[in-house]
Amino acid sequence: MVNPSYEPLYVTYLVYFNRDRDYFECHEVLEELWLKLDRDPVYKGLLQIAVGLYHFRNGNYRGGYMMLDSAVHRLEHAASHALGINMAKLVDEARACARQLAEAVMEGSGELQRQPPVYRDLTIEIVEPGLRQAVEKALSSVPVNIPQQRGPRRGEKHEQRQQALEASIRRRQAAGSLRSATVETKDAP
């Protein structure tokens, strides 16, 4: 029997985290739960781990470090199996990622370009059988986001403005090349 006490948004977070590695969606669903639960610090720490991994994977090493470091400080005193997961293991892995990012950021941008830190996904180990069952059941009902949002994305209006700007530049370039061709023809002997 599935434990009904597990928040569906928390279960969805675990699906996106472990199955899809979709840290953007992890943030979206867990932020909703975090706000609903009066900004519970443990949920905030889990949210920050997802955001930190999102930044790390997308090359924002400073942002990744800041989020992961904050998450570690927020979660390091939580019970080792809080919320039905191996919290101690997750905190240790997040701490290792934060340490790696801190070293990379301290070395400077030149070194980052030559040898960026190696990214790896984390997996949240589910230790409570009822939670594991709830997550397995949710696998078929939580849709996979394809394509995943792996980088910063702007809305449709931005895309339309960008296309209009590019078209304007092409028109000006074409008009400029016509003018220069006309000038060259007039100057020809």
Residue ranges and their predicted role:
Residues 12-13, 44, 51:
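Structural register within alpha-helical repeat arrays
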Residues 53-58, 92-112:
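Alpha-helical linker/edge segments of TPR/alpha-solenoid repeat scaffolds
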Residues 22-23, 61-62, 68:
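TPR-repeat structural position
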Residues 17-29:
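Helix-turn-helix repeat elements of alpha-solenoid scaffolds
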Residues 29, 48, 67-74:
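Alpha-helical solenoid repeat scaffolds, predominantly canonical TPR units
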Residues 40-42, 75-89:
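Boundary/linker segments of alpha-helical solenoid repeat arrays
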Residues 106-189:
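A hydrophobic membrane-anchoring alpha-helix module
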